[in-house]
Amino acid sequence: MNKSELIQAIADEAELSKRAAAEFVNAFVSVVTQELKDGNDVTLVGFGTFHAAQSAERQGRNPKTGEPLTIAARKTPKFRSGKALKDAVNG
């Protein structure tokens, strides 16, 4: 499912206009992104938690030349699914 299909599904499920559903999806993505940038987790009880995991600086290799290089530390967005979501997916 892509973004436009998600917007249509939300519009149908919540009996909203497609425009209102699009505004909701865009606002949700914007708020979650900003919270992760600020170092906060976003938890939807039963559904899951969005969080930013910190990876340490590490050594790597340039695949083209084989030269060693340093890969900088960075944050990576992650999602941990909640129990209710896991149960729903597994039947």
From Swiss-Prot:
It comes from the Bacteria. InterPro entries: Hist_DNA-bd (IPR000119), IHF-like_DNA-bd_dom_sf (IPR010992). The keyword DNA-binding applies. The keyword Secreted does not apply. Disulfide bonds: none annotated. GO terms for biological process: chromosome condensation. Transmembrane segments: none annotated. Gene3D superfamilies: IHF-like DNA-binding proteins. One of its GO terms (molecular function) is DNA binding. Keywords: DNA condensation, DNA-binding. One of its GO terms (cellular component) is cytosol. Histone-like DNA-binding protein which is capable of wrapping DNA to stabilize it, and thus to prevent its denaturation under extreme environmental conditions. Belongs to the bacterial histone-like protein family. This is DNA-binding protein HU-beta 2.
